[in-house]
Design a protein with these regions (language model features):
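Short, basic/aromatic recognition patches
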Residues: 43-51
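Cofactor-centric catalytic regions
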Residues: 179-238
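Proteins synthesized as precursors that undergo proteolytic processing into mature forms
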Residues: 1-37, 51-203
Length: 238
């Protein structure tokens, strides 16, 4: 995620967007990042794997923030519950490549390839927003784009979550939300092989993101969970 956002620093985006230039940059950065990932971090799991990942964000009245992503990987994970805590253990060891000699091979002291991208963004030394998602390899594109909507285009948290996105998390095509305006869709189609992919309840074609944000001016707190998911929710203290 850090590398993907850093690559945007070299791109001058038109004001008032995101316009076609922004989505072209998003698609290029995500495709390059995914290619780098395969070359240096091993193969990823199949996109049809069941989603057993949960992400939560918390902000307290003092502006302290937490972004936490937890995953079981397979349904019920390893099917082992720790007796002292009741926590269900995942079976994330299968993220490793069992074959020796690959970037993601199982070895002592190594961390397996994962998709989780919890992130806290700071502005002027203070936590500004916390964000993350569930949804396998679609997590990074979702978190990346929403973060850019907030950072580069000055959107409100609500507008950023409702804005249509793309997904370039592997494969030969870029998934494009048909709600994107025609100039954006045409520019993407001219540059990359694309496929129209609607935002629906299931499958989660664009991940299941959530975020909390603290307004640095008024100190107000805002939170948004995935607008399509019946499994997302939010709680506020009055």
């Amino acid at each position: 995620m850090q590398r993907a956002l850093a690559r945007l620093q070299d791109v001058k985006l038109r004001a008032g967007g995101p316009h076609a230039d922004a989505f072209l940059a998003y698609a290029r950065v995500l495709r390059e990042g995914y290619a780098e990932r395969l070359a240096t971090m091993g193969e990823t799991s199949d996109h049809r794997d069941p989603s057993t990942t949960t992400h939560l964000n918390v902000v307290d009245r003092h502006g302290n923030m937490v972004a936490l992503t937890q995953t079981l990987l397979s349904v019920f994970g390893s099917k082992v519950v720790l007796p002292s805590s009741g926590i269900l253990m995942n079976n994330g060891i299968m993220w490793f490549d069992p074959r020796p000699g690959s970037p993601n091979s199982l070895a002592p002291g190594k961390r397996p390839l994962t998709n989780m991208s919890p992130m806290i963004v700071r502005r002027d030394g203070k936590a500004w927003f916390a964000i993350g998602a569930s949804g396998g390899r679609k997590i990074l594109p979702a978190v990346f784009q929403i973060s850019s909507f907030l950072i580069d285009h000055g959107m409100s948290l609500e507008d950023a979550f409702h804005h249509p996105r793309i997904d370039a998390s592997g494969g030969d095509t870029v998934s494009v939300d048909p709600r994107l305006v025609e100039p954006v869709r045409k520019a993407l189609g001219d540059a990359f092989p694309t496929v129209d992919t609607e935002l629906v309840v299931y499958p989660t074609n664009y991940a299941c993101p959530s975020s909390v944000l603290r307004d640095p001016n008024g100190g107000m707190h805002y939170g948004v969970s995935d607008v399509m998911s019946p499994w997302s929710g939010a709680v506020a203290e009055s």
